[in-house]
UniProtKB/Swiss-Prot annotation:
<feature type="glycosylation site" description="N-linked (GlcNAc...) asparagine">
    <location>
        <position position="55"/>
    </location>
</feature>
<dbReference type="InterPro" id="IPR010480">
    <property type="entry name" value="Pepsin-I3"/>
</dbReference>
<dbReference type="Pfam" id="PF06394">
    <property type="entry name" value="Pepsin-I3"/>
</dbReference>
<feature type="compositionally biased region" description="Low complexity">
    <location>
        <begin position="99"/>
        <end position="112"/>
    </location>
</feature>
<keyword id="KW-1015">Disulfide bond</keyword>
<feature type="compositionally biased region" description="Low complexity">
    <location>
        <begin position="209"/>
        <end position="229"/>
    </location>
</feature>
<feature type="signal peptide">
    <location>
        <begin position="1"/>
        <end position="16"/>
    </location>
</feature>
<protein>
    <recommendedName>
        <fullName>Uncharacterized protein F32A5.4</fullName>
    </recommendedName>
</protein>
<keyword id="KW-0325">Glycoprotein</keyword>
<dbReference type="InterPro" id="IPR038412">
    <property type="entry name" value="Pepsin-I3_sf"/>
</dbReference>
<feature type="disulfide bond">
    <location>
        <begin position="141"/>
        <end position="239"/>
    </location>
</feature>
<comment type="similarity">
    <text>Belongs to the protease inhibitor I33 family.</text>
</comment>
<keyword id="KW-0964">Secreted</keyword>
<dbReference type="InterPro" id="IPR051901">
    <property type="entry name" value="Protease_Inhibitor_I33"/>
</dbReference>
<dbReference type="GO" id="GO:0005576">
    <property type="term" value="C:extracellular region"/>
</dbReference>
<feature type="region of interest" description="Disordered">
    <location>
        <begin position="95"/>
        <end position="126"/>
    </location>
</feature>
<keyword id="KW-0732">Signal</keyword>
Length: 243
């Protein structure tokens, strides 16, 4: 079993290869520890993945101030929910020796303030988009924001034709990677006995019902999609690495 899983993981790694894109979007750190990936603003200067972009406008500075307030509120809500859930868990463990009715009452009374929902993270500011932070790694260079970087140093801007070429490559590469992932899932499912094995492992009828909702017509198309992949997109030649 372990060998089969390892083979599947290796196949995914080979399919990805070096010309795949890397999407780097900044995340909110509840603990306060962060980094330079994604969008970073300091002194009203905007950076994307450590690369300086431009100064913020006055309206963008106001938008950033609103975002900072919302982030602090979001962090506070998360901490309160985590604290409440730790308290609920502690009460459940302490009440194991009591009778079932008493335990039920304790859990319901302590968990009344926790509805199980996680607050939604605030929307990123309009000046921090996926287009700003997406990095495309090719042999010898990296492209971000339609600019070419070599060894972390700015080299040049893409031409209008190259920008169109990159957009086409992005669309085709995304479709190719999705098809590879879908094929791998079908192959792994076949290796482990299909839905019967997974049903026995993960919960019987509930798993079957979920699979039927997600894949209502998976009987015939599965065999075709598992063997057919779109052509691998042609990698743009924005730079030449000499080996």
């Amino acid at each position: 079993m372990k060998l089969l899983a390892l083979v599947a993981l290796c196949a995914v790694g080979v399919a990805s290869h070096r010309d795949k894109r890397q999407l780097s979007i900044g995340t909110i750190s509840v603990s306060g520890a962060g980094g330079s990936t994604g969008c970073v603003v300091t002194g009203n200067v905007l950076y994307a993945n450590g690369i300086r972009l431009r100064n913020l406008t006055s309206s963008e500075q106001s938008e950033l101030a609103t975002y900072q307030t919302e982030v602090e509120q979001y962090k506070t809500q998360l901490r309160n929910i985590l604290s409440q859930r730790r308290e609920n868990l502690r009460n459940r463990l302490m009440s194991q020796g009591r009778n079932q009715q008493q335990q039920s009452n304790d859990v319901s009374s302590q968990g009344g303030n926790d509805d199980g929902s996680i607050p939604k993270a605030p929307e990123k500011p309009s000046f921090c988009t996926a287009e700003d932070t997406t990095q495309y790694y090719f042999d010898g260079c990296m492209v971000q924001g339609n600019k070419v970087y070599v060894g972390g140093q700015y080299a040049r801007d893409l031409s209008s034709d190259e920008i169109s070429e990159l957009q086409t490559f992005d669309t085709q590469q995304t479709a190719y990677q999705n098809a590879v992932q879908s094929q791998m899932q079908s192959q792994v499912q076949g290796l482990f006995g299909g839905s019967d094995f997974l049903s026995a492992l993960f919960g019987g009828d509930r798993f079957n019902q979920q699979q039927q909702r997600q894949q209502p017509s998976s009987t015939t198309p599965a065999s075709t999609s598992s063997t057919t992949l779109p052509p691998k997109p042609t990698v743009p030649q924005f730079c030449t690495a000499i080996f």
